[in-house]
């Protein structure tokens, strides 16, 4: 049996290892998962309370158009319901966009170190992928603009960026958008939008009034703590959303997920508290890194990236101490946890870097 030739160069997405998988390698003790940027505090208590009180007929299909959820999102964001598209997580939304827009001979442009699903789905559709290196961990929009051509159908911008946690500011993004043809779709993935505290972070939704070629993505998997429910959404021009709905699978968001997301979206106090605690957690890591002269990227997300050469060693040290983090070829990404969890990881990092310094001194004196 034959499949698309382009699939031969791809591998299935590999998520962070689960505690169960870690036990098979590192022994049967408890693990704290800090690899997938999930909310360590879970979701709003309102969600749990309301779901326990409500009754859903599990024999019936969900609302295929996610009408109540889309209207709730639209009301809060001050857009029309027809401008909102819901998917089973942003992974499905990215797949829908790629399937609807791309064809063989087209190309996409994005960063070299960013969310891998942009590249993954472009290759499946037979497209060229133009990847531009980050500039000190940040999207280089000037360089991206220089490689966009007439065959560029999508520019993907992850803002804040995963895995570095960095962001493109309002001035740079607006300037970039002004220089891109209306024939090229600019997708701005704001999965970590709720965590942002930077004053010059761009507010992208008002840009939709002027630019029909902008699509903004957000999710309930991160700050809202609903990763297991799989709900993400896109906001864009009505005509584009209508076309994307053509490739959307019927009944793609479950009834339970729609209800949970609708409830969660109304609990602003919960999100405010999550952002406050997350900001404190980031300061824990930043203070430690500054005191010990360990490189890190200033993060606007719920994780921190350390661009170090020995990421594999750090991963192993954390794993043996019961912490699951995410290794990369050029560093490690650590999800911000509870204060106690952060202290635990920092203790491991402290010991690791002290051991490396001691080893370097011993080698120099040998």
Swiss-Prot record:
Record PROSITE patterns:
AA_TRANSFER_CLASS_2 (PS00599)
Which Pfam family is an annotated match for this chain, by its short name? Answer: Aminotran_1_2
Q: How does it assemble?
A: Homodimer.
Residue list for modification N6-(pyridoxal phosphate)lysine:
222
Q: Which cofactor does it need?
A: pyridoxal 5'-phosphate
Cite the source lineage: Bacteria, Bacillati, Bacillota, Bacilli, Bacillales
Q: Which GO terms describe its biological process?
A: L-histidine biosynthetic process
Kindly list the GO molecular function terms attached to this UniProt entry: histidinol-phosphate transaminase activity; pyridoxal phosphate binding
Region spans: Disordered: 1-21
Q: Which NCBIfam families match?
A: hisC (TIGR01141)
Which family does the entry's similarity section mention?
Answer: Belongs to the class-II pyridoxal-phosphate-dependent aminotransferase family. Histidinol-phosphate aminotransferase subfamily.
User: Which segments show compositional bias classed as Polar residues?
Assistant: 1-11
Q: Which reaction does it catalyse?
A: L-histidinol phosphate + 2-oxoglutarate = 3-(imidazol-4-yl)-2-oxopropyl phosphate + L-glutamate
Keywords attached to this entry: Amino-acid biosynthesis, Aminotransferase, Histidine biosynthesis, Pyridoxal phosphate, Transferase
Pathway annotation: Amino-acid biosynthesis; L-histidine biosynthesis; L-histidine from 5-phospho-alpha-D-ribose 1-diphosphate: step 7/9
Question: Which protein is depicted?
Answer: Histidinol-phosphate aminotransferase 2
EC category? transferase
Q: Which domain of life is it from?
A: Bacteria
- Provide the transmembrane region boundaries: none
Task: Report which gene this protein is encoded by.
Answer: hisC2
Please state the Enzyme Commission number of this protein: 2.6.1.9
